A protein has these predicted regions:
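Phosphate-coordination/substrate-recognition cap region in phosphate-metabolizing enzymes
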Residues: 2-18, 56-126, 194, 209
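Phosphate-handling substructures
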Residues: 88-152, 211-217, 223-238
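Short glycine-enriched, charge-decorated loop/helix-capping segments at active-site entrances
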Residues: 38-46, 112-114, 186-188, 229
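Loop-to-helix element that buttresses phosphate recognition and phosphoryl-transfer chemistry
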Residues: 25-81, 86, 137-152
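Domain-level recognition of soluble alpha/beta enzyme cores
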Residues: 186-211
């Protein structure tokens, strides 16, 4: 082998060049709250058994792909546990938990079933359902603009640290929807984000340009004929 070959620089993880980070975003596995149609928001709920199985399946899939430089995650238990399973499978020791990746704060809607929220907290539910992006949810809840700013800003920071590298990020349904909207703002399609689904972004660490390559990919669940009982695929259950 020539000296040049021995010291060859590996190609960047992103097909768009060394300025871009390939950011693989995974929604956490299922929780009992998802299964029961409970609005979780920033409630700290663990995975249920189905969610743990989903996390193992997505981890198994990601372990067969290019090794990530790091795994980042929301610090909420359902995301952190999913991230830990992925990091272990991918043999990655660099696991970073950060509240910037948390789900949308749902204010007065926290802990309510969707059907009950419409009746018991009509003002909060109306605010949640509003298409006005600056509309905050009563009880300290975030607006969509606030959610987007928090999540997008942190992914830009991650991309700046990992130019030319691949990283995995574990987050939540509504947060991931906002990331997709930021990358593709002209689309009117509401994207379905099932539990442990994969979205792939290429993000320039210099210019902040985003490219959405893939969203809502659950091929790892289909291969094992695993039931996709993933309420909140629209981001609603968080």
């Amino acid at each position: 082998m020539s000296e040049r070959a021995m010291h060859a620089i590996p190609p960047p993880a992103s097909s768009h060049g060394e300025d871009f980070a390939e950011v693989v975003v995974v929604r956490h596995g299922e929780t009992q709250g998802n299964a029961l149609r409970i609005i979780q928001g920033q409630m700290d709920i663990e995975l249920n058994e189905a969610g743990r199985q989903q996390a193992v399946m997505v981890a198994r899939r990601l372990a067969k792909e290019a090794k990530p430089a790091a795994v980042y995650s929301s610090d909420l238990k359902r995301a952190a546990e999913t991230a830990e399973i992925i990091a272990t499978a991918c043999n990655v020791s660099n696991l970073v938990l950060n509240p910037a990746l948390r789900e949308r704060h749902m204010g007065d809607l926290h802990g309510l079933k969707f059907d009950d929220a419409v009746r018991s907290k009509p003002d909060a539910y109306k605010a949640f359902s509003s298409e006005e992006r600056s509309q905050e949810i009563p009880g300290g809840g975030e607006s969509l603009d606030q959610l987007s700013e928090r999540c997008v800003s942190y992914l830009n920071t991650i991309a700046g640290k990992h130019k030319g590298e691949r990283v995995i990020v574990v987050s939540h349904g509504a947060s991931i929807e906002e990331l997709c909207r930021h990358a593709d703002p002209t689309s009117s399609v509401r994207r379905r984000i099932p539990n442990t689904s994969i979205c792939v972004f290429n993000i320039s660490g210099t210019t902040g340009h985003w490219i959405l390559e893939r969203f809502g990919d659950v091929a790892h669940l289909n291969e094992d004929d695993f039931p996709q009982n993933a309420f909140g695929g629209d981001g609603a259950s968080t």
